[in-house]
Amino acid sequence: MIITIGGLAGSGTTTAAKILSEKLQIPYLSAGEIFRQMAVEKGMDILEFGKFAEGNDEIDLEIDRRQAMLAKDKQDLIVEGRLSAYFVEADLKIWFVAPLDIRTERICMREGKTRDTVKKEIITRGKSEATRYQEIHGIDIGNMEVYDLVINSHSFQPEGIAEIIFKVTEVISCQQ
């Protein structure tokens, strides 16, 4: 089964994808990790690379290309990334939401930065990504119609989210 998991920064996609990968015993691929790897390749931090990518369509197209290439010919895979649902043929497409303050707190704990710094970075990064996605792909990141399931990750613990998704995969398997 191919599953895509997307969500804004700090919404819990990486945590849930890793737990689900272990639970289902299937590999996990992160578009965010591809983006971070490309930033390192260019010698930039995430915010710098995001701004650079905003003026360079080739960056987004390369991320999409790398993701599609790595996902190609897989029978079972979890693909985590904001646009994964648009570029990966999947049996289940999931989007995570969470309040800005919750996402800010999660990133603060993960990266050890101040709340104000993280909140500004989330807002800046979100605007940058929304602009790039609209300009390059014509995708409105706020449009949930492409997703089969939208989960408020603030409402559940990560293990509970993985269990919800697992149950949905069981339902899908029964319908095939």
Language model features with spans:
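ATP-binding Walker
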Residues: S11
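Walker A/P-loop
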Residues: T14
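ATP-dependent small-molecule kinase phosphotransfer cores
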Residues: A31-F87, L100-D101, G112-T117, K127
